[in-house]
Amino acid sequence: MISKRIQEQLKKGSPIREAFEEGQRLAKIYGAENVFDFSIGNPYVEAPKKVKESIQKIIEQNPRQIHSYMNDAGYEDVRKKIAESLNRRFGTSFHMHNIIMSVGAAGAMNAAMYALMDVDDEVMVMRPYYPGYTSFILNWQGKKVEVDPDPQTFQPDFEDFESKITERTKLVIVNSPNNPTGAIYTEDTIQRLAQILEKKEQEYGHEIYLLSDEPYRELVYTGETLPYLTKYYNNTLVAYSFSKSLSVPGERIGYLVIPDEVSESQMLIKAVKMTTGMIGYVNAPSLFQKVVAECLDEKANLEFYQKNRDVLYKKLCDLGFEVVPPSGAFYIFIKAPGGDEKRFLEKAHECNILLVGGSFFGYVGYARISFCVSHEKILRSLAAFEKLAELMRE
């Protein structure tokens, strides 16, 4: 018999996967070109050519070693190159030992949380948030604490944030650019979060860690370079994934940054290397560690997403929908007219538009649109959104 904990999770299901499967069903009825599945954040553009070239070169150079075990933290030469790249781009001072290769950002976060959390420790998440955080916290028997946003900007509500920090607070997760809103945390936001956390660390006499989840760091439409959070708050960890920047989500490759400034950093580095193995990952994928090291200055054609964003955002605004301006990532967070999320999703379904409700992201009354699809699909969907706007006015 499966555990009660997992039984509860199975009952909840995954609206994203359910919408994806519904899209496949509708495509058989109406034709794939007439179904507009915006439910899943699966990168559409191809990986850079250098990814393929690197795979071929690396396999030919050492066909035996590339499939072998290595240091739990990953290949030393790879970690050294990543540290140097970060230092060059963000003015940091990382070394090889500060980088632990991981099975994507999710693997990095889980290894860090396993190393840091005791039963009933509290983890703060900023609404709306990636729903996987709920599972990660549950994995390590923690308690999720939700922080409200400013509904106009989707920056954190600082009063709510500070009021909910307790003696049991161990971690604060931030995600910028944000999934599902596309909002980017400003430098002022980062500074204010850091000030509050420093104050609360002194008040409670123990560390509170800031865990920055950064799979969308390169997906920015405003031309700005995002603040690198380790420069603002000492007890900051960074979980990074190459899934979006290189369009390789299925390869599950990323890393965790543990700066020297983190309290007892050397002990934490040892702990995360251990928990990586205890979770069952052993080490990050061998081949793709080497591949990403060759592609640190490469990016997929991320400008493609801006073209989709611009067309769809303008259309939705023209139709009178209330939309969060997406500054990054590849999502649009749209407010359900009248706040009726259920009716909005149902009417969208009638138009063969598949979305994910905001309640799945901890924020009722909205829906997420993933615009990481072909540009042709975006253009074909505009008439369907016109129909949806008409239905919502009835």
Enumerate the predicted regions with their spans:
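Alpha-helix termini
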Residues: 25-31, 89-91, 196-208, 260-266, ...
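Conserved core segment of the aminotransferase class I/II
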Residues: 231-306, 389
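N-terminal small-domain helix-loop-helix segment of the aminotransferase-like
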Residues: 2-104, 111, 157, 295-298, ...
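Conserved glycine-rich beta-strand-loop-beta hairpin in the small C-terminal domain of fold type I
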Residues: 286-293, 305-317, 323-335, 365
